Structure formats: C-alpha cells, structure tokens
C-alpha cells in the first residue's frame, strides 16, 4: 500500500455556529449528505457536529487533490460511524470517480474537536 493522498483541515466551531444562525439549515444542507442531515436534525450541538463534518470533507477533498471544486462537492463525501464510533468516509459522485482513477483502495479518517476547533485528517491509500 502507498499513500496517494493526504489532507487535513481545521474549522472554528464558533464560525460554523454563526453561519448556522445566519442561514439556518440551508448551510447544513449545503454541507451534509441526506443521511448526515437526518442525524444532524436530532442533535443539540449542531454547530459542533457540522464543524467536524466540514473539516472532514475539506480534508478529504484536499487528499483527493481537488479541494471542493472541479465537480467535487461536499455531498460527494458522507461520514458515518462504525459500531465502535470510528468515523467512516464514503465517497460518491466525482470524488468516487477521481479516487478510482488514483487507485484508492483504503481511506483513513480521524476527526477530533475541543472547545473552539474541529480538526480532521484523511489519508488515501492505493
């Protein structure tokens, strides 16, 4: 296995919370996939959840080498959790096509947050 992509991102939770207060769920709908949005709707700490998802998707787009551009959107990345809480990143759309072109066979994702920030790192391996 070889690393074919590495990305990291940090998001300020308060900034995400302000965006939510300005635009409401429209901001969340722009960032989250349908399954993520359904989970988000039942949460108390929506800003924290969204900041972690935002950081993870930005990190994934950087690992892909495109950022959120060139046809890659936030909806191309879905984050779920396994039974132990480990985050799982699933690709779709243009992100999936580009990852297949780079022979990505394994994705590593870690997400962490503390009082003011959420951070994520993504590694793509072939």
Curated annotation (Swiss-Prot):
GO terms for biological process, alphabetical: fatty acid biosynthetic process
GO molecular function, one term: magnesium ion binding
EC number: 2.7.8.7
Superkingdom of the organism of origin: Bacteria
Cellular component aspect of the GO annotation: cytoplasm
Cofactor(s) needed: Mg(2+)
Function according to Swiss-Prot or TrEMBL: Transfers the 4'-phosphopantetheine moiety from coenzyme A to a Ser of acyl-carrier-protein.
Protein name as catalogued: Holo-[acyl-carrier-protein] synthase
Organism this protein belongs to: Aliivibrio salmonicida (strain LFI1238)
